[in-house]
């Protein structure tokens, strides 16, 4: 039986369990003690260091790609474990690592109080060659263009679309690669970065660091890199850093103002309400940051969901039905599907949409799940369809969530708001009567929910067509909707209906 090495920040482990990583769910180990130590970093990635060796018998070359990266990455304690090699195999990860799909018993543990000091010991014994910034082997270009090439290749390898955002962190840590990055952006038809963008990107990553201190962003390294390559930016970057020494409310204002820049068309008054809520909160700074960070994570999730490409004919020719319970959405959408010979998709159909509903437990709140369901279904459409929303799928109390939903649904040309009457109280009465006809034991919760759906303005704001359904049969409703779509009457529909109401 041979022995392998594994590094972990956790001490006292009697067995190592497989963990999901880049290559799959494995326990990782290596034949080389020095390599296990080099993997003990607490943070950092390919943008902060490079690791390789020229041949199997040569020393590992560890290159610091940004100032002070080694101190940041390795200023931690860790444990070096030995494990038997019996269940491990080589899947060619790119390093001299072996993997095991099953849990592994540990044979021994050696606690290392400072990983960086241990690496220096390995350097003195010629097992590792350290290159402190800006020193580097000749094979690594001084302008860091190799990192730009790696970013492009990674996008190709993972089949992820290359966007301007793909290069943000690269530019944040390696502003000297600006010209090379812009060359790649020109290839994909994107507007180039300028030096002012570097300031905005620095601000963005500074806020990330403030919101979640446990995730190291290498702020100090970025500051030094920007100052070195663009001395004219040093004063403004320094002023951003100074916010770390300001008062709690000043830091919170800075965080929120920076986040708001991402949402230029978000209603200013609603943003001010959110800002005032946090500025007047009795919660600790740490709790406020945690709460805001959770919102940012949710926003990132929503942005990722709604940014997917949707075929233009789907956006132009699909018909989306929204409205409260009992508004005849399901009946009308079924008949419309038959008339137009278009597939119908119901967001309440748990069986057909099982792959989405099975993920319900992954979301903290039901509204988070509803947003995921709605956006996933809409962005997965390949051909025009009739989409039947559930009553709550288009109503969001959270202003940011509604803002994101609005950005998605506004891409669709035909969004039909089904409503019994232009008078809200009359609508509520008719809707509840319909619910009772459907189920005489209908709970008051449904009635209360309908009142909420009617009083919220969400459906009115996102719809392009408003169809009043009282005293009309389904065929008549369908004919009216088709006529409005064909004649584009819906552009002035709200004005005409309000005049008719008067």
What are these regions (language model features)?
Residues 365-409:
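Glycine-rich phosphate-binding loop used to anchor ATP phosphates in small-molecule kinases
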């Amino acid at each position: 039986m041979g022995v392998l090495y594994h590094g972990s920040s956790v001490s006292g482990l009697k067995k190592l369990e497989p963990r999901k990583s880049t290559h799959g769910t494995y326990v990782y180990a290596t034949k080389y003690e020095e390599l296990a130590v080099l993997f003990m970093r607490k943070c950092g990635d390919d943008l902060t260091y490079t690791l390789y060796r020229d041949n199997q018998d040569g020393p590992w070359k560890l290159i610091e790609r940004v100032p002070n990266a080694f101190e940041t990455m390795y200023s931690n304690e860790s444990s070096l474990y030995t494990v038997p090699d019996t269940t491990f195999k080589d899947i060619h990860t790119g390093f001299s690592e072996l993997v095991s799909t099953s849990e592994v018993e540990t044979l021994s543990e050696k606690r290392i109080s400072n990983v960086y000091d241990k690496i220096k010991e390995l350097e003195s014994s010629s097992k590792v060659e350290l290159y402190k910034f800006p020193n580097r082997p000749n094979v690594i270009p001084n302008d860091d263009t190799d990192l730009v090439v790696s970013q492009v290749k990674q996008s190709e390898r993972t089949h992820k679309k290359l966007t301007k955002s793909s290069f943000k962190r690269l530019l944040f840590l390696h502003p000297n690669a600006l010209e090379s990055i812009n060359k790649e952006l020109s290839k994909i038809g994107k507007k180039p970065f300028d030096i002012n963008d570097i300031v905005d990107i620095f601000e963005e990553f500074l806020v990330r660091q403030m919101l979640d201190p446990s995730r190291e962003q290498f702020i100090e390294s970025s500051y030094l890199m920007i100052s070195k390559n663009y001395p004219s930016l040093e004063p403004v970057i320094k002023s951003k850093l100074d916010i770390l020494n300001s008062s709690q409310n000043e830091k919170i204002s800075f965080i929120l103002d920076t986040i708001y820049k991402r949402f230029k068309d978000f209603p200013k008054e609603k943003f001010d309400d959110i800002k005032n809520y946090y500025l007047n909160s009795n919660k600790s700074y740490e709790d406020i940051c945690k709460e805001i960070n959770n919102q940012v994570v949710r926003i990132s999730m929503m942005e990722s969901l709604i940014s997917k490409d949707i075929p233009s004919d789907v956006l132009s020719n699909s018909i989306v039905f929204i409205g409260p319970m009992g508004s005849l959405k399901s009946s009308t959408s079924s008949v419309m599907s038959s008339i137009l010979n278009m597939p119908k998709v119901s967001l309440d159909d748990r069986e057909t949409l099982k792959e989405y509903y099975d993920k319900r437990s992954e979301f903290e709140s039901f509204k988070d799940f509803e947003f995921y369901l709605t956006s996933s279904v809409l962005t997965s459409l390949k051909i025009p369809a009739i989409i039947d929303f559930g009553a709550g799928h288009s109503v969001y109390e959270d202003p940011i969530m509604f803002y994101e939903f609005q950005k998605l649904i506004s891409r669709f040309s035909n969004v039909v708001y089904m409503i019994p009457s232009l008078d809200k109280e009359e609508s509520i009465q008719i809707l509840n009567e319909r619910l009772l006809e459907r189920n005489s034991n209908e709970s008051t919760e449904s009635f209360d929910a309908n009142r909420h759906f009617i009083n919220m303005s969400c459906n009115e704001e996102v719809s392009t067509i408003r169809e009043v359904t009282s005293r009309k049969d389904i065929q008549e409703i369908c004919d009216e909707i088709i006529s409005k779509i064909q004649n584009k009457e819906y552009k002035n529909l709200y004005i005409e209906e309000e005049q008719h109401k008067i």
